Amino acid sequence: MALQAAYSLLPSTISIQKEGKFNASLKETTFTGSSFSNHLRAEKISTLLTIKEQRRQKPRFSTGIRAQTVTATPPANEASPEQKKTERKGTAVITGASSGLGLATAKALADTGKWHVIMACRNFLKAEKAARSVGMSKEDYTVMHLDLASLESVKQFVENFRRTEQPLDVLVCNAAVYQPTAKEPSFTAEGFEISVGTNHLGHFLLSRLLLDDLKKSDYPSKRMIIVGSITGNTNTLAGNVPPKANLGDLRGLASGLNGQNSSMIDGGEFDGAKAYKDSKVCNMLTMQELHRRYHEETGVTFASLYPGCIATTGLFREHIPLFRLLFPPFQKYITKGYVSEEEAGKRLAQVVSDPSLGKSGVYWSWNNNSSSFENQLSKEASDAEKAKKLWEVSEKLVGLA
């Protein structure tokens, strides 16, 4: 059979050598010179015809003179090298993934079996326990330390991530600080008010540093997602509940350039609830500016979203007890805007990976029937001139300019 296979590699015009062994129909027959029998000639002709028919039906092969190696043309449905590159799991970095929306999103992505999640969190042990508590498999996540209230921690996280030599396909800026009842401001390591320093400046530096990594991604859709908030969108009912978000002319934020950090972006008196709302406007303005500056050049999709009101989330843990008691039923039965953490996580996971939500520069929201749509940003959250100024001031504050 070995010689028969070798014959199949030769052009049909080459004749059989006059001396050798020929294996046909699993029976070895010896022939020498001119002593061919009529039976052997007939057997030879029949075998060659069979071999030619097999060659006609099988893929062509390229052979060397000795026919020592055989290279078959790959089947038409075999993955190309470009397709094979995207068969790996996607890698998504999610900030604040130890609880709430971040944890629910990490689980939703991990459950698909198509993603490895980097849980970028301030409390390593809390994140590890949280991942196990929701049943995430160890092979689907990695916990890495990140404290967005420290610009040095942000830089260290980026350095540590790059040491892993993992690709980066999606960055989700989710973590947030909310101190609505605070009477006095708290500050970050660099002296910024805690809400703007964590929610905006920490994420601003992180997104700028990791943009280079996103550019290199060969994943089908590389994305940067910033979680927004309806409370910072003043063209909605919730956005008009006092105190309303208002960045003014950014004089308070810009004062940090002179070492005179203000507790409020607009330079006004401190208000914990407004500080949070202002920071979310900054998030949405940053997303718009990232889209304008980098989408066309890099192919990265930049988007923000409001997944619905997660009224039971730990984000409200510093609100007064009466608020925490009444707010969930109010959202469930009056406004109908309530969503569970699990549902909100699935929505954010959609924005991470769903091809139908791959449009850049969009602020995504959901109807009560869970259908996604492109929401309208308020004038404050879509002001191109203010976004540019915020970008320039923020670059200087985090040391990028």
Curated annotation (Swiss-Prot):
Q: Which GO terms describe its molecular function?
A: NADPH dehydrogenase activity; protochlorophyllide reductase activity
Task: Give positions of region: Disordered.
Answer: 65-90
Chemical reaction(s) catalysed: chlorophyllide a + NADP(+) = protochlorophyllide a + NADPH + H(+)
UniProt feature, compositional bias: Basic and acidic residues: 81-90
Upon gene disruption, the observed phenotype is: No visible phenotype at the levels of the whole plant or chloroplast ultrastructure; due to the redundancy with PORB. Porb and porc double mutants have a seedling-lethal pale-yellow xantha phenotype at the cotyledon stage, contain only small amounts of Chla, and possess chloroplasts with mostly unstacked thylakoid membranes.
User: What EC number(s) is this enzyme filed under?
Assistant: 1.3.1.33
Give the pathway: Porphyrin-containing compound metabolism; chlorophyll biosynthesis
Report if keyword NADP is assigned: yes
State the UniProt keywords alphabetically.
Chlorophyll biosynthesis, Chloroplast, Membrane, NADP, Oxidoreductase, Photosynthesis, Plastid, Transit peptide
Query: Which stretches are tagged as biased composition: Polar residues?
Result: 65-74
InterPro entries listed in its UniProt record: NAD(P)-bd_dom_sf (IPR036291), Prochl_reduct (IPR005979), SDR_fam (IPR002347)
Record text on subunit structure and interactions: Part of the FLU-containing chloroplast membrane complex composed of FLU, CRD1, PORB, PORC, CHLP and HEMA1.
Output this protein's name. Protochlorophyllide reductase C, chloroplastic
Which species is this record about? Arabidopsis thaliana
